[in-house]
Design a protein with these regions (language model features):
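Secretory targeting and sorting signals
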Residues: 2-32
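Exposed, interaction-prone regions of secreted/extracellular proteins
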Residues: 25-26, 30-290
Length: 290
């Protein structure tokens, strides 16, 4: 079943950049650590790369169809493929709704070419079978051969991606969570390595349906389709938890889908591995950019 591709970039990033000026400086919270000082050219490049993200959304699952082959390793597991997602989603095939999702990872290191590419890593509620996503995570952007890393949140489609931290670095220890209470969603990122990238924000959504929980590596999409996926090598999600009603568990506690990212020809772009023995972790491996 095909779904609408999200409008994630109003134009190709490289084409947008000449129209952008320098971004307004980000002020970390009191007591937060800051990244090392950049030279003026490096600071300008970082500002342009960040400014290009103003038009970026990290949106909903673009396609949903079964991958050939059985999925017998984990009870309740379904294998599907997507043109923009890789990872796991807990769904609502048994009527579940979700109120909390958490995940942990070490920020992957992106290998860049001269081409612009993107890779987003996040946890969230909704988006797998619904039109909204309440999410937060990190993002690797390859721009002119250099990798830039950010922390962000988004209440799709209400707002574009909200970049908070611009000093995320490969190896940073990231914890992400989304918690619902009533119509309020608290989105929190903790960067235990560089605290300037940490944040907590509470947003309101009265129409969100909470019918899925996700742990995802994503290739964002623009007006021309799915953008090239940055070579992040591997992304290892660990210590994932989820809550549905009064039940607390891990990914495998609820009906879960293993999602592999493919291109329009069916070739694998990012391969999702099996859940670990605890049912709370997995690895996504990059295979191609497009």
């Amino acid at each position: 079943m095909h779904r609408r591709l999200p409008w994630l970039l109003s134009c190709a990033l490289a084409a947008c950049v000449p129209a952008f000026g320098l971004v307004v400086a980000y002020s970390p919270t009191a007591g937060a650590s800051t990244a090392p000082a950049h030279s003026r050219p490096e600071a300008r490049a970082l500002a342009i790369a960040r400014q290009a993200l103003r038009h970026l959304d990290v949106g909903q699952h673009a396609t949903d169809h079964r991958v050939s082959g059985s999925a017998t390793r984990v009870k309740g597991l379904t294998q599907v493929s997507s043109t923009n997602w890789a990872g796991y989603a807990d769904d609502n095939t048994k009527g579940n709704t979700y109120s909390k999702v958490t995940g942990k990872w070490s920020e992957p290191s992106a290998s860049c070419t001269s081409a612009t590419s993107l890779a987003a890593f996040w946890v969230g509620i909704d988006g797998y079978t619904s039109a909204s996503v309440e999410q937060d995570g990190t993002l690797a952007e390859c721009y002119l051969g250099t990798a830039y890393y950010f922390s962000w949140w988004e209440m799709y489609p209400s707002n574009a991606i909200q970049v908070v931290g611009e000093s995320v670095a490969p190896g940073d220890r990231i914890t992400a969570s989304v918690v619902k209470s009533g119509s309020r969603y608290t989105l929190k990122i903790t960067d235990a390595t560089h605290s300037a990238n940490s944040f907590t924000t509470t947003q309101t959504c009265s129409s969100c349906v909470d019918t899925s929980a996700e742990w995802i590596a994503e290739a964002p999409s623009g007006s021309s389709g799915v953008e090239p996926l940055s070579n992040f090598h591997t992304w290892k999600e660990s210590s994932a938890t989820v809550k549905s009603g009064s039940a607390k568990g891990v990914i495998s506690t609820f009906p879960d889908d293993e999602i592999t990212m493919i291109n329009s020809s069916g070739a694998t772009k990012a391969k999702t591995g099996s859940l670990n023995s605890s049912g709370n972790g997995f690895t996504v491996t990059w295979e191609r950019s497009s």
